[in-house]
From Swiss-Prot:
Could be involved in insertion of integral membrane proteins into the membrane. InterPro entries: Membr_insert_effic_factor_YidD. Keywords: Cell inner membrane, Cell membrane, Membrane. It is a peripheral membrane protein. This is Putative membrane protein insertion efficiency factor.
Length: 82
């Protein structure tokens, strides 16, 4: 499922997105955010994070720099015991 979603996103980025105006209020763009979220968190949680991001894409939100949250189980401890 993850592979299919990433292929659909790539198709969108190469064939559909260039036809639309570039007025995304966030960095990275929503499609880049979706690719990163799905790659990091899997299809279900990645789609949920993407949905929440797209909901924020409206005139009452300032936008700006918004990255995919890091998964706790995928992160490495910052301090090691010696």
């Amino acid at each position: 499922m993850t592979r299919i979603l990433l292929l659909l996103l790539r198709f969108y980025q190469y064939f559909i997105s260039p036809l639309l105006s570039n007025n995304c209020r966030f960095h990275p763009t929503c499609s880049e955010y979706a690719k990163e979220a799905i790659s990091m968190h899997g299809s279900i949680k990645g789609l949920w994070l993407t949905f929440k991001r797209i909901i924020k894409c409206q005139p009452f939100c300032d936008g700006g720099y918004d990255t995919v949250p890091i998964s706790i189980k995928n992160s490495k401890p910052l301090n090691k015991k010696i």
